[in-house]
Amino acid sequence: MKSGEKNYSVKEAMIFSQRIAQLSKALWKCVEKDWQQWIKPYDLNINEHHILSIAYHLKGASISEIAKFGVMHVSTAFNFSKKLEERGYLVFSKKEDDKRNTYIEITDKGEELLLRLMEEYDPENNSVFNGALELRNFYGKFPENIELIAILRNIYGQDFIDIFEKSLENIEENFTETDQKLVKK
């Protein structure tokens, strides 16, 4: 192959891009609806819940990290974090050696809320989970999404995937199931 020559056709690229776009949009519509229904009783929106979750799993983070790992603009991360601070779920701070960045930590009240939400998670009310259940029943496990993870690693970087994996490991290691509810060990 000559330098600058592409090993794919424009048609192939268009079909792949459109497939990903359509599937992502359809999947997001279900994810968004399920997520909103889950957190609605606690007067949270998706960004607020995501920020609480990231702050919990990272044991504190800068606003820039929240934006990066929450896949949101820095101003969105800051504004929603501010609302969570006003409600007593987060605290803001600056580090002595880094006055430029604003850091957040989840408060006890914020952690209690997040843990209550985790306890209240009901897989029966999650359409994506239910859509994948047949695959689990057939193959004995849920899809691992390795191709999707590889694509996201190429877009957002390895540290994005590491944080994503760390949050799942935290749930695996620090939570147990009691009476069909997820509770902290």
UniProtKB/Swiss-Prot annotation:
Coiled coil: none annotated. PROSITE patterns: HTH_MARR_1 (PS01117), HTH_MARR_2 (PS50995). Residues 63-86 bind DNA. GO terms for molecular function: DNA binding; DNA-binding transcription factor activity. GO terms for biological process: negative regulation of DNA-templated transcription; response to stress; sporulation resulting in formation of a cellular spore. Homodimer. PANTHER family: DNA-BINDING TRANSCRIPTIONAL REPRESSOR SCOC, TRANSCRIPTIONAL REGULATOR, MARR FAMILY. This is HTH-type transcriptional regulator Hpr. It comes from Bacillus mycoides (strain KBAB4). The lineage of its organism: Bacteria, Bacillati, Bacillota, Bacilli, Bacillales.
